[in-house]
Curated annotation (Swiss-Prot):
One cellular component term from this protein's GO annotations in UniProt: plasma membrane
Membrane topology (Cytoplasmic): 1-17, 60-84, 135-156, 219-242, 299-331, 377-399, 446-457
Record localization: Cell inner membrane
Periplasmic-facing ranges: 106-113, 178-197, 264-277, 353-355, 421-424
Protein name, as recorded: Proline-specific permease ProY
PANTHER family: GABA PERMEASE (PTHR43495), THREONINE_SERINE TRANSPORTER YBXG-RELATED (PTHR43495:SF6)
Species lineage: Bacteria, Pseudomonadati, Pseudomonadota, Gammaproteobacteria, Enterobacterales
Membrane-related topology note: Multi-pass membrane protein
Family: Belongs to the amino acid-polyamine-organocation (APC) superfamily. Amino acid transporter (AAT) (TC 2.A.3.1) family.
Pfam families documented for this protein: AA_permease
Function description: Permease that is involved in the transport across the cytoplasmic membrane of proline.
InterPro entries for the chain: AA-permease/SLC12A_dom, Amino_acid_permease_CS
Length: 457
């Protein structure tokens, strides 16, 4: 590959650490958590802890391979190297499909959040505006992207911490609630902690895993990280603490100060909770934060697909034109392709603004879980491929080795079973498997084309 089509290593440890902090703090938490709360009640806290453990196992498996061999197409390349070309092809394209679906959910959420302030403006106008703005940002240098993502993430992380502190002020001292402490009795006084039974908590796991979708972007940043051996482990090791603080902490506060069964879905439950309590100033600030979070998520979505398609083009799994980069090292063709695909979200928000999110979230969960399964299978094959002395020399090993990875794999297969069990999300399983069939057909055509090219040479 010519040097002019190479990506540039412009992401510092600071950029990558905050991308790790911010990557999973987005639409799944700020908006999708409402559906998870409805399914499980307060026991959704336990679901987020269980899902968080699985997410950390996936990140450690990806981190082990990323530190050993940092590459822009990351898990697609690892699947190709360890499981074969077909696995790499399916993984790369399914990740692009996943992130496109997630991005549609993110831009849809952006329109919903803007609707809180401007209820008379159609959602699709906001969706179109944000798609064009993010496209422009991603056509600049990777350093501009990293800097913008740093400040997006810094702002939402800082505000969530302030919100948690303020929430404890309401819980303990009644600040902003007329001096009346709310306590934490709401966690059990509306049907108990397991208000919808154990089954409700288990069923919520699919929405919980949607919230964690996107964390795998840290593997993709390895190709543009200045010092992947330091930055990747630091970023991944921050995962357990951020799950406890940002997911469990925020939802603990929300469900303590406001009954879980009155959390609505007409906007972010974070915003609606403060609105219902009459603290409109806090609600307005939080709406601005969730807007920032969705912008950050869309920004990362476009970045992730762009780098994945670029790497796949280098591997021969995507059209060669996708490997083209600008003078600044930006894969501009793939950024424009992603932007064009996102215009479909504008159309969806025009024809069915009320029902877009839940359908898209379940479809994204299937694609996300599929990619995670391929990451874990790649790590198992990667370990088997290495001689024992090289396994010992690995700089960032999965704790517990392959046994831990297999445990994560069983959990993810269970999540796919849940998607098929739930009537509202079963269709996403059909669409997901149809997507895999389409990819297999595409692979057959690709192989035939490659053979013809080889014969003609």
């Amino acid at each position: 590959m010519e040097s002019k089509n190479k990506l540039k290593r412009g992401l510092s440890t600071r950029h990558i650490r905050f991308m790790a902090l911010g990557s999973a703090i987005g639409t799944g938490l700020f908006y999708g958590s409402a559906d998870a709360i409805k399914m499980a009640g307060p026991s959704v806290l336990l679901a987020y802890i269980i899902g968080g453990i699985a997410a950390y196992i996936i990140m450690r498996a990806l981190g082990e391979m990323s530190v050993h061999n940092p590459a822009a197409s990351s898990f697609s390349r690892y699947a190709q190297e360890n499981l074969g070309p077909l696995a790499g092809y399916i993984t790369g394209w399914t990740y692009c499909f996943e992130i496109l679906i997630v991005a549609i959910a993110d831009v849809t959420a952006f329109g919903i959040y803007m609707g809180v302030w401007f209820p008379t403006v159609p959602h699709w106008i906001w969706v179109l505006s944000v798609v064009l703005i993010i496209c422009a940002v991603n056509l600049m240098s990777v350093k501009v992207f990293g800097e913008l993502e740093f400040w997006f993430s810094f702002f939402k992380v800082a505000t969530i911490i302030i919100m948690i502190v303020a929430g404890f002020g309401i819980i303990i001292w009644g600040i902003g609630n007329g001096g009346q402490p709310t306590g934490i009795h709401n966690l059990w006084s509306n049907g108990g902690f397991f208000s919808n039974g154990w089954l409700g908590m288990v069923m919520s796991l699919q929405m919980v895993m949607f919230a964690y979708g996107g964390i795998e972007i840290i593997g993709i940043t390895a190709g543009e990280a200045k010092d992947p051996e330091k930055s990747i482990p630091r970023a991944i090791n921050s995962v357990p603490m951020r799950i406890l603080v940002f997911y469990v902490g925020t939802l603990f506060v929300i469900m303590s100060i406001y009954p879980w069964n009155q959390v609505g879905t007409a906007g972010s439950p974070f915003v609606l909770t403060f609105q219902h309590m009459g603290i409109t100033f806090a609600a307005s600030i939080l709406n601005f934060v969730v807007l920032t979070a969705s912008l950050s998520a869309i920004n990362s979505d476009v970045f992730g697909v762009g780098r994945m398609l670029h790497g796949m083009a280098e591997q021969g799994s995507a059209p060669k034109i996708f490997s083209k980069t600008s003078r600044r090292g930006i894969p501009w063709v793939t950024v424009l392709v992603m932007t064009t695909a996102l215009l479909f979200a504008v159309y969806l928000n025009y024809i069915m603004p009320e029902n877009v999110f839940l359908v898209i979230a379940s479809l994204a969960t299937f694609a996300t879980v599929w990619v995670w399964i391929m990451i874990l299978l790649s790590q198992i094959a990667f370990r088997r491929r290495l001689p024992p002395e090289e396994v010992k020399a690995l700089k960032f090993k999965v704790p517990g080795g392959v046994a831990t990875t297999i445990g994560g794999l069983i959990f993810l297969l269970f999540i796919i079973g849940l998607i098929g069990y739930h009537p509202d999300t079963r269709i996403s399983l059909y669409v997901g498997f149809a997507w895999i069939v389409v990819l297999l057909i595409g692979w057959m055509f690709k192989r035939r084309h490659d053979r013809q090219l080889a014969e003609n040479q």
